[in-house]
């Protein structure tokens, strides 16, 4: 027997009904296996928060705008997302934290791509909402165990480099575009020879007419090997393998491996999570470290009421795979409140992180022994920032000075030496029990007395400050 769209069958009534009748379940207790999400929801005028939260749960899981008879062909209660709690956002009008629980069966194993497609893929354009932001997610251990995670992790990287007890030092080669491959390699050599551990391609240097990737790789690795031989330290350069296609990306990665590169680089947001996960698995299989740049992140995470918070993007990267990830500086030119920044830094590198609203962490996260990601502090930092950077980030971080190395009045190598001396002075002072937060400037001045390179850097950048209030606050 055929039925029209308006006829009633057993258990089915066609038409449109409020989302909250099905997807708002305040009595629900989340399971240990649920993926949990916290959304900041701004409803349109006249839309109750319960309806808005339920709409988010519905449109990011099993729901659509009208009742469909095929709901009868599945167990909707088993598969639907549930808005189980709603809280007003403190200090904000008509904004609510809506907490949604998703059954684990909604997501493909080991796929950040699928997880994000479900949770944020469609609902952000929903007309009933003025704005929507994904603030945090809780990934259950049962789902985490389907991901490889970082190719190597912090401890394996330290063992590969034979460097312990201090942050690593890096430098982004500037100008980021326009140098020939040979001159680029020269800058790499000078910075590594001066005392840095790493140098780096910038995010947008791929394979342009002025510098094709193969030429850059060859000149750079010649510089790396020469600096290693002269200093006796293991050195590296982040060779950017981001490419127009995955096939080309792997071609570049294979060539980097052939010429002895210990580390390569990838722009994970612009290239996509599928490409990144594939590259991370290749890096583990081939013993290559993977540096991750977050180019394009601020397009997604900068607005306070719409988008995806970087702590979510950082969690997704740890699952997808990367050994380093840019994470802001707190003290440099880029956005970064200290409490919030350290919240997602801990989520990158610690094994277990308790919920802490003061740091923007809405859920306790157990990483189930997944290797950690080393945060990279980069953007407008120089020698005067060194004490604060060491005090804030501790040992397991990469402190990356681009202009703060290459902008030294005496050149690249003295700039690198100034940073290395400043770092070693801060580590020694800390290990002797001195307070870097209170005595930082004095520690740098003392070291500058016997290091002319550091003294010149201190004089050049003594007046440089970036005093803007962060946008990303609680």
UniProtKB/Swiss-Prot annotation:
InterPro entries: RuBisCO, RuBisCo_large_chain_AS, RuBisCO_lsu_C, RuBisCO_lsu_C_sf, RuBisCO_lsu_fd_N, RuBisCO_lsu_N_sf, RuBisCO_lsuI
EC code: 4.1.1.39
Catalytic reactions on record: 2 (2R)-3-phosphoglycerate + 2 H(+) = D-ribulose 1,5-bisphosphate + CO2 + H2O; D-ribulose 1,5-bisphosphate + O2 = 2-phosphoglycolate + (2R)-3-phosphoglycerate + 2 H(+)
Molecular function, one GO term: monooxygenase activity
Record keywords, A-Z: Bacterial microcompartment, Calvin cycle, Carbon dioxide fixation, Carboxysome, Disulfide bond, Lyase, Magnesium, Metal-binding, Monooxygenase, Oxidoreductase, Photorespiration, Photosynthesis
GO BP: any one term: photorespiration
Cofactors (names): Mg(2+)
Subunit structure: Heterohexadecamer of 8 large chains and 8 small chains; disulfide-linked. The disulfide link is formed within the large subunit homodimers.
Species this chain originates from: Synechococcus sp. (strain JA-3-3Ab)
PANTHER family: RIBULOSE BISPHOSPHATE CARBOXYLASE, RIBULOSE BISPHOSPHATE CARBOXYLASE LARGE CHAIN
Subcellular location: Carboxysome
Active site residues of this protein: 174, 293
Binding site for substrate: 122, 172, 176, 294, 326, 378
Chain's gene name: cbbL
Entry-annotated residues carrying N6-carboxylysine: 200
Post-translational note: The disulfide bond which can form in the large chain dimeric partners within the hexadecamer appears to be associated with oxidative stress and protein turnover.
Note from the entry: The basic functional RuBisCO is composed of a large chain homodimer in a 'head-to-tail' conformation. In form I RuBisCO this homodimer is arranged in a barrel-like tetramer with the small subunits forming a tetrameric 'cap' on each end of the 'barrel'.
SUPFAM superfamilies on file: RuBisCo, C-terminal domain, RuBisCO, large subunit, small (N-terminal) domain
Keyword Nucleotidyltransferase assigned: no
GO cellular component: carboxysome
UniProt name for this protein: Ribulose bisphosphate carboxylase large chain
Record-listed Mg(2+) binding positions: 200, 202-203
